[in-house]
Design a protein with these regions (language model features):
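Histidine-dependent nucleotide/RNA phosphoesterase domain, centered on the 2H-phosphoesterase fold
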Residues: 1-140
Length: 140
């Protein structure tokens, strides 16, 4: 596992102040961890090299990030926004995984799971915590 850090961000906007997605959904009840953009660039570069430069990745809309809460309305909304903007450490497995063109790395972080519990959500999210670095679905 490799240690890194990011910043907690509640209800992340898709564009300047916009929370509505193209499919009509919302990012209102989302909690992500913004990760270092350079980490994302580096990991996408390693992916491209591993694929012998035959595949590239498009960066995620939010940049490299960990989705801690994905649209689950918390049971205890009073705790929503707790520690917004705070730094948080996490460990990630350096072996990339790919699902439906999305490339990600498994993450371990007890503090993120503690936040889920404080909000009245199941400790373990589904899918499990992971660092998203890009997708190969829409690249040329």
């Amino acid at each position: 596992m490799i240690r890194s850090f990011g910043t907690l961000r509640y209800s992340p906007a898709l564009r300047a102040g916009v929370h509505t997605r193209r499919d009509g959904g919302t990012t209102r009840w989302w909690l992500i961890v913004d990760c270092d953009p350079e980490l994302g660039r580096y990991l996408r570069h390693l992916y491209t090299i591993a694929k012998r430069r035959t595949r590239t990745l498009q960066a995620p809309l939010w940049g490299p990030h960990i989705s801690v809460i994905r649209g689950e309305e918390p049971h205890d909304v009073r705790a929503w926004g707790e520690h917004d903007g705070a730094a948080i450490e996490f460990d990630y497995d350096p072996n990339a995984r790919e699902t439906d063109g999305y490339v990600w790395y498994p993450v371990e972080c007890a503090a993120m799971l503690d936040l889920r519990e404080r909000l009245g959500l199941a400790r373990e999210p589904s899918p499990a915590l992971h660092l998203t670095i890009g997708n190969a679905r829409y690249t040329r």
